[in-house]
A protein has these predicted regions:
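Generic cytosolic/nucleocytoplasmic N-terminal low-complexity/intrinsically disordered segments
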Residues: 1-2, 319
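Ser/Thr/Gly-rich flexible loops in soluble cytosolic domains mediating phosphotransfer, phosphorylation
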Residues: 127-128
Length: 340
């Protein structure tokens, strides 16, 4: 089964690459000079946003006949996601790909898209991030920072892996897991009953193995790629957050580029964006059987639990939105309506 799933995913990526190649355009580069773009990434080499950013860079270099190249790094070699975002804002770096939640210190309204359970499913995620809500947020980012958002890469829903079976909300009470040191995460998991502690991602595996904590939460592909199935044998698909990354460029740098370069970069990403979303969804859907092959039991919340979750968070959404700044209270009503 594992080999079949791998072959399916490889075939999907090959089909996507073929489709992208067929759609190539020609550009007038006769008056253009060579350009090197600095593009550091915070995530590791297996992360979906890293994989597709690398494909995007290759496409840009090819379409520019080698005139556009990249000074590229990943795995937070040049700093954390927040540091890289601030570096793009200050003009220290030209581009990056950053989780949306990192922007809230500069644009508090971004948290309206990062609220727990505000994204219902993949169809809803596409409607939100390809539609009015994300357009509003990216407009605010451009107004308040020297940053232009070129697009979004969906990363998937976050779930909890644990050493003990968790099958319902009641099982989560006082269960100790690692969460990022962010208020929204602590609020979300705490509201489900979890006891939350923060530590670096690099320490989490050994902490679970040693029994210091009982589990952690992130996307399924990250859990699998880092081998958490060896130290924790249960997953509860809580789907408490939908993770996404914004593809950003320093606005001053962007506006000084030749129009043909902007077209190459933007056109290429438009094609990569669609492929990345399809791959992220397909990958997430393939994860459950892969975990089961590793001896992991996967649970889902019941319909009754989902009703309780909506009761827990519907008031929370509105209370939080009021504190996020102008327009957030109206946007939360739009997001709630889009879940219907």
């Amino acid at each position: 089964m594992k080999k079949v799933l791998v072959l399916i995913l490889v075939a999907l990526m090959c089909m996507q690459c073929a489709a992208l190649a067929e759609s190539e355009q020609t550009y007038d580069l006769s008056s253009c000079e060579p350009l090197k773009i600095t593009l550091p990434l915070p995530n590791g080499i297996t992360a979906i946003d890293t994989v597709y950013t690398e494909q995007w860079m290759e496409m840009i270099t090819e379409r520019s006949n080698g005139l556009i190249t990249f000074d590229y790094s990943n795995s937070a070699a040049l700093g954390s996601a927040l540091e890289l975002m601030e570096g793009v804002d200050m003009g220290d770096y030209d581009m990056s790909v950053i989780d949306l939640a990192n922007f809230d210190a500069y644009v508090p309204q971004v948290d309206v898209l990062c609220l727990p359970y505000i994204i219902k499913d993949w169809d809803n995620a596409r409607a939100v991030y390809m539609g009015e809500p994300n357009a509003w947020i990216t407009g605010l980012i451009s107004e308040n920072m020297d940053i232009t958002v070129l697009g979004t890469i969906g990363m998937g829903f976050r779930s909890v892996i644990s050493k003990d079976p968790l099958t319902c909300i009641a099982d989560c009470k006082n269960y100790l897991i690692r969460t990022p040191d962010l208020e929204l995460y602590i609020d979300a998991l705490g509201s489900l009953g979890f006891s939350c502690t923060s530590m670096s991602f690099s320490e989490t595996y050994s902490a679970i193995e040693a029994g210091v904590i009982n589990g952690m939460e992130t996307t399924l592909n990250v859990l699998y790629d880092n081998g958490y199935y060896d130290v924790a044998k249960y997953i509860l698909q809580t789907r408490h957050f939908f993770a996404c990354s914004e593809v950003i460029v320093n606005t001053s740098f962007w506006e000084e580029l030749p129009e043909v370069y902007r077209s190459i970069i933007a056109d290429s990403f438009k094609e990569i964006e669609a492929a990345a979303w399809d791959y992220a969804q397909t990958t997430e859907e393939s994860m459950v059987p892969k975990f089961e092959e590793k001896g992991v039991t996967v649970y889902e919340f019941s319909d009754e639990d989902h009703v309780e979750i909506l009761n827990i968070f519907s008031d929370y959404w509105r209370e939080k939105a009021v504190k996020m700044g102008e327009g957030a209270d109206e946007m939360i009503e739009t997001l709630i309506a889009m879940q219907q």
